[in-house]
């Protein structure tokens, strides 16, 4: 169980980084366009 949770945590962190990258860029462009 410990190893499975560790792998899931790593996968979740990787997915979060992968999704957060474009999301931050989108927010920056959106705010720049809004301003």
Swiss-Prot record:
This protein's record includes keyword Membrane: yes
Transmembrane segments: 7-27
GO biological process, any: photosynthesis
Location of this chain's protein in the cell: Plastid, Organellar chromatophore thylakoid membrane
Pfam families, per database record: PSII_Ycf12 (PF05969)
Subunit structure: PSII is composed of 1 copy each of membrane proteins PsbA, PsbB, PsbC, PsbD, PsbE, PsbF, PsbH, PsbI, PsbJ, PsbK, PsbL, PsbM, PsbT, PsbX, PsbY, PsbZ, Psb30/Ycf12, peripheral proteins of the oxygen-evolving complex and a large number of cofactors. It forms dimeric complexes.
Family the entry assigns: Belongs to the Psb30/Ycf12 family.
Protein name: Photosystem II reaction center protein Psb30
Species, as recorded: Paulinella chromatophora
Gene designation per UniProt: psb30
